[in-house]
């Protein structure tokens, strides 16, 4: 009787390291991975098809729910594609606000990735550290949109509203004494820009804390150095983008190579790795957090000095202001028509891509002249990255497969769509 050497193991979909609903069928020789077969589709919600039955504005909130860790970056790509079709100019202040919140979103994403990736590899402390900073970033989301996650803040032609002049404050309660309350509200006395500036000033110290815990940690290096190595040419051939591509040594960043909004005016560097392993991708993302913080500082300085409109004055696309709507019946009718019937987009097609925290996130829109898209195609970076898992995991131990899944920073909202 022949000896059975290899056996199959189901990893997920209810596994804490699966980062969502990944079902991974692993063929193992002992603890060594011989083949990894990802099964996707467990979070499929037909977003692309739904968009064909919704007006252009009604489709916007669906974008938040694709990669639900990088909400506004998804909206950004959708709005850019729609503005291309409409030939719609965006006010300069709105562009700066978009870039500001795109980088805030990058920090949100990378903090989530760092905490969960380290937790998967056995360092649960990192999760507590990173979520401490994420709370402040969510407060920024809440201040402009009223929602802590699914903001729907970016709009075709600009953003929903200007930055508020005050920050919400913590109220007195039985669980906080006056001293604790004063400490919580210390940096909330001014405007949202003051709050963001305060965060940007202290955030580099937080990143230093993360690096103290991980960068030279012997166990962390043993779990990541030499794991999941991808050569530069192979990374290109596999369709990798974002930190996955830059970790292999290729300095491709859409904010530099194909700048959109006001990224050409921003001063920042593009970090790249050398060996293309999990450790290099970790270093790239950590440095990206520092660079994103630099961009946030530049946006805050410009926005303080330059007031102006934050959405286009094209009333066929932009909704009237609340004050006008409450005092003028025509404005109220216009608002109602815009949000029920929507606006018609000229016939044509457009592709817009942004440097999403996970890679190149693209939206391909086809219009037939109606108030709904004829076709909406989403180019999700995680889809291409997950397809490389089999190649990256072969020959590694099963515990290393967890580190490789973590380094990909995958979210199934965008992969399954």
Curated annotation (Swiss-Prot):
NDH-1 is composed of 14 different subunits. Subunits NuoB, C, D, E, F, and G constitute the peripheral sector of the complex. The keyword Iron-sulfur does not apply. This is NADH-quinone oxidoreductase subunit D. It is a peripheral membrane protein. It is found in: Cell inner membrane. It comes from the Bacteria. GO terms for cellular component: plasma membrane. Its main location: membrane. It holds the Pfam family Complex1_49kDa. It catalyses: a quinone + NADH + 5 H(+)(in) = a quinol + NAD(+) + 4 H(+)(out). NCBIfam families: NuoD, PRK06075.1. Belongs to the complex I 49 kDa subunit family. One of its GO terms (molecular function) is quinone binding. Keywords: Cell inner membrane, Cell membrane, Membrane, NAD, Quinone, Translocase, Transport, Ubiquinone. NDH-1 shuttles electrons from NADH, via FMN and iron-sulfur (Fe-S) centers, to quinones in the respiratory chain. The immediate electron acceptor for the enzyme in this species is believed to be ubiquinone. Couples the redox reaction to proton translocation (for every two electrons transferred, four hydrogen ions are translocated across the cytoplasmic membrane), and thus conserves the redox energy in a proton gradient. The keyword ATP-binding does not apply. Its EC number is 7.1.1.-.
């Amino acid at each position: 009787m022949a000896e059975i050497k290899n056996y199959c193991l189901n990893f997920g979909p209810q596994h804490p390291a699966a980062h969502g609903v990944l079902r991974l069928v692993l063929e193992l020789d002992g603890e060594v991975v011989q083949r990894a077969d990802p099964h996707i589709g467990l979070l499929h919600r037909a977003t692309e098809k739904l968009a064909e039955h919704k007006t252009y504005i009604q489709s916007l909130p669906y974008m938040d729910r694709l990669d639900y860790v990088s909400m506004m970056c998804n909206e950004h790509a959708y709005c850019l594609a729609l503005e291309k079709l409409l030939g719609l100019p965006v006010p300069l202040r709105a562009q700066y606000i978009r870039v500001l919140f795109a980088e805030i979103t990058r920090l949100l994403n990378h903090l989530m990735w760092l905490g969960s990736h380290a937790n998967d590899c056995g360092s649960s402390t990192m999760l507590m550290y990173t979520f401490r900073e994420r709370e402040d970033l969510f407060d920024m989301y809440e201040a402009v949109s009223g929602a802590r996650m699914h903001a729907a803040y970016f709009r075709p032609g600009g953003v929903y509203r200007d930055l508020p002049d005050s920050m919400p404050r913590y109220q007195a309660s039985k669980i906080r004494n006056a001293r604790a309350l004063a400490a919580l509200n210390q940096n909330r006395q001014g405007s949202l820009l003051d709050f963001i500036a305060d965060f940007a000033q202290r955030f580099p110290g937080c990143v230093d804390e993360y690096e103290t815990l991980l960068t030279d940690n012997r166990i962390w290096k043993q779990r990541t150095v030499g794991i999941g190595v991808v050569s530069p040419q192979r990374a290109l051939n596999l369709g990798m983008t974002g930190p996955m591509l830059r970790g292999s040594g290729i300095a491709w960043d859409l904010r530099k190579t194909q700048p959109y909004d006001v990224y050409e005016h921003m001063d920042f560097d593009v970090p790249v790795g050398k060996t293309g392993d999990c450790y290099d991708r970790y270093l790239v993302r950590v440095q990206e957090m520092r660079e994103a913080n630099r961009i946030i500082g530049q946006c805050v300085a410009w926005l303080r000095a330059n007031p102006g409109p934050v959405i286009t004055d094209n009333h066929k696309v932009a909704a009237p202001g609340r004050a006008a709507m409450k005092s003028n019946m025509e404005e109220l009718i216009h608002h109602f028509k815009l949000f029920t019937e929507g606006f018609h987009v000229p016939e044509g097609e457009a592709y817009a891509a942004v440097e999403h925290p996970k890679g190149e996130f693209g939206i391909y829109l086809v219009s037939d002249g109606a108030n709904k898209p004829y076709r909406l195609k989403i180019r999700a970076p995680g889809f291409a990255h997950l397809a490389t898992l089999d190649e990256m995991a072969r020959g590694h131990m099963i515990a290393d497969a967890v580190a490789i899944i973590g380094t990909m920073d995958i979210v199934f909202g965008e992969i399954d769509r």
